[in-house]
Structures are given as structure tokens and as C-alpha cells.
Amino acid sequence: DLYWEVIEVPTEDLKSKDSYYSFHLPDEVNRVKGVTAIILKETPDEKELPEIEKREGKNWIGLRIRNKGKITDIYINQLADGRLMHSNSWIEADGWSTDAYMFIVTYPEKSAPADAKEYFIGYGSSLKRGTTSYFSSLAKLFIIQKEENRRMQLWIDGSTKVKAYIRSLQCPVSVSVNGESIPIVYDHSNLKIEL
């Protein structure tokens, strides 16, 4: 039977936790191609709901969500689902290159994706746009990055030791990882993270 479990994840502002439902299929399957979005209204009268557009490209599927002046692009890498271990799982999606299973980029409606200050990288070691690196690590990690008023908040999981580089156009005035402040090591638009 189809079943679900409740999973705790960081909230959008990374200050607390929120619960989400993970649905599990009754049988093991080799490949599932699909994205499901369930949007619940805050009130019965709510009329302004997100606009969702289905998207796909070579070896990826995704969504573009427009809501309250922001665009969120969601990409699922169909080569990085765990079946191709030790194989190349790189994709090119809308100018981004990555080996991540999933990545999400959020940016204001009137700006370009390259100017985004919010990212999610799900089990990846690199995110690039052209020759510009936005994230680089020797280990595949889970990362949430949110930058506002030159304050960088990160949530990182996936390895006990982390050495990563994250793009930031200006040197942040503060950096926190998983709620803890860390020293700022910044050089040429790159923030070095060592845990």
C-alpha cells in the first residue's frame, strides 16, 4: 500500500523546523518520472495561489513556480537518482551545470537566475553557470543557502567533515552554518566553508 512518513526539515528562514510528508510507493520501482505539487490554501477565501509550470530538458524534469514576486526553479536530475553509481551524472539545465540529484534556485521576478540569493542543492558536489562556480565541494552534500543584507545563512548536511566553496558577490558581514556562527574566509567572490 501507498504510505507516507513525516519528515522534519528547516523552515524557509532556517530558524526552525517544519514538517513535510514523504510518500512511498507500495513496490520498489526502478524509475519514477513525476513531480506532484499539493498546495493547501491558508484560508478558504485565499485566491492568490502559486502559478506552476511543468518543465523538462535532456535528463532532467522540473517546475517553475511564480509566487508573490519570486520565481523558484526546481530541477530533478534523472541521471543522479542512485542507479548510476560511479558514473557521470552531470546535467545542463537552463544554463546551470550540476551533478546534484535536485537543485532549486529562487530569485526575484524581475532579475536573472544568476542573481539568485537562495539555493537548495540536494546531494551534489557542484553547481556552475557557465564558467562561474556557485558551489563546489569534494563530497556530495545537502545545502540550503540564503543570503540577505549581506548575512549568509547556510544549512549543510551529508558529511561529518565539510570543505566547500560558495559564491557570494560581496563579502558577507556574518556567516552561520546550521545556526552556528563561523569565521568568514572570503576571496574573489568565494566563501570558504570548513567544518
Where are these regions (language model features)?
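CBM-like, beta-strand-rich accessory domains located in the C-terminal region of large
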Residues: 1-173, 177-195
